Curated annotation (Swiss-Prot):
The keyword Coiled coil is annotated on this UniProt entry: no
Function: Involved in regulation of the cell cycle. Required for mitotic cell division and cytokinesis. Based on its localization to centrosomes and spindle microtubules, as well as to various cytoskeletal components such as the median body, parental attachment disk, and anterior and posterior-lateral paraflagellar dense rods, may coordinate reorganization and segregation of tubulin-containing structures during mitosis and cytokinesis. May regulate microtubule disassembly by phosphorylating cytoskeletal proteins leading to their destabilization. Phosphorylates EB1 at 'Ser-148' in vitro.
Localisation per UniProt entry: Nucleus; Cytoplasm, Cytoskeleton, Microtubule organizing center, Centrosome; Cytoplasm, Cytoskeleton, Spindle; Cytoplasm, Cytoskeleton, Spindle pole
Catalytic residues, chain numbering: 143
Oligomer and partners: Interacts with EB1 (via C-terminal residues 101-238).
Protein name: Aurora kinase
Organism: Giardia intestinalis (strain ATCC 50803 / WB clone C6) (Giardia lamblia)
Length: 311
């Protein structure tokens, strides 16, 4: 990123919206809009997230936005979307972000319904690596879900590409699904993230999305980084079968399911994936599998990504 692109509080040339060519609309975020843009001097293509100060103030989330900027600007990992810089004018705050050319994981989940196990293995491994990095920096993410994971180009060997392209037995839809095992998946949103400077520290703030909330957060109890382990388990479950593990049309029952850890497996799950999820979705935070053991689990060590498309 060009050196002159610095936060408005830093040194050097002050970044303004005039430094960018604004392209197509990419989507709507929690507190603003996202556009494709190009920084004019470097020609670097970025995602420009626009937050409106009036809305931030009306929602009383000034502190949350400041925390998001502070945390996101100071993390750097292959599985985390890069926040290059941010700046502001009288009415807006602008975040200059790495582009994710293949969009949100949630959009792909809506498109395909569910994913083959090797694809899920790749997604969860990438996300778990990012969580391991964050936890080592005493950062709790607190809002892991498909909407907050973006898809970028990964490393696909020529052998894989040739094999996929030469296989006339699969449709374009199936071909794209198989390719998903070779993309790179990155955490994108740090709106609910928090830095806890004390190792092993605990918090009580309720946040996140109900379907992924661990019991201790939902019930307003103190919690620690193990909250992200539970959410990772709920995400893994949803990617495999297409439905969150504790979901019910009635919110009251969803809450009961979470509190009692009541869920069941469909035929989509392998023995390894069942064991993997069961080790994360445990009522007691202290009993949940560690992020290091997650990355060593057999389910995340699958190497055959040329799987059949789920029916």
């Amino acid at each position: 990123m060009p050196q002159h692109l610095v936060p408005h509080t830093g040194t050097g040339k002050r970044t303004t919206i005039e430094d960018f060519e604004i392209g197509r609309f990419l989507g709507r975020g929690k507190y603003g809009l996202v556009y494709l843009a190009r920084e004019q001097s470097s020609k670097l293509v970025v995602a420009l997230k626009v937050l409106y100060k009036s809305y931030i103030k009306s929602e009383r989330v000034e502190g949350q936005v400041r925390r998001e900027l502070d945390i996101h600007l100071n993390v750097r990992h292959i599985n985390i979307i890069r926040l290059y810089t941010w700046f502001q004018d009288e009415t807006r705050v602008f975040l200059v972000l790495e582009v994710a050319p293949y969009g949100e994981l949630y959009q792909r989940l809506q498109q395909f319904g569910k994913f083959p196990l090797p694809v899920v293995s790749k997604i969860i491994r990438d996300v778990a690596q990012a969580i391991q990095y964050l936890h080592r920096k005493n950062i709790f993410h607190r809002d892991l879900k498909a909407e907050n994971i973006l898809i970028c180009k990964g490393k696909e060997t020529k052998e894989h590409t040739d094999a996929h392209n030469s296989d006339d037995s699969i449709s374009v839809h199936e071909h794209e699904l198989v390719r998903m095992a070779h993309y790179t998946y990155k955490i994108a949103d740090f709106g609910w993230s928090v830095h806890h400077p004390t190792h092993g520290g605990r918090r009580r703030t309720q946040c996140g999305t109900l379907d992924y909330l661990p019991p201790e957060v939902m019930l307003g109890q103190s919690y620690d980084k193990a909250c992200d382990i539970w959410s990772l388990g709920a995400l893994c479950y949803e990617l495999i079968c297409g439905t969150a593990p504790f979901y019910h049309d009635e919110i009251k029952i969803t809450r009961q399911n979470i509190a009692n850890v009541e869920y069941s497996f469909t035929k989509d799950f392998s023995p390894a994936s069942k064991d993997f999820i069961q080790r994360m979705l445990i009522r007691s935070p202290e009993a949940r599998i560690s992020i290091e053991d997650i990355l060593r689990h057999p389910f995340l060590r699958q190497t055959d990504h040329r799987s059949k498309v789920p029916k």
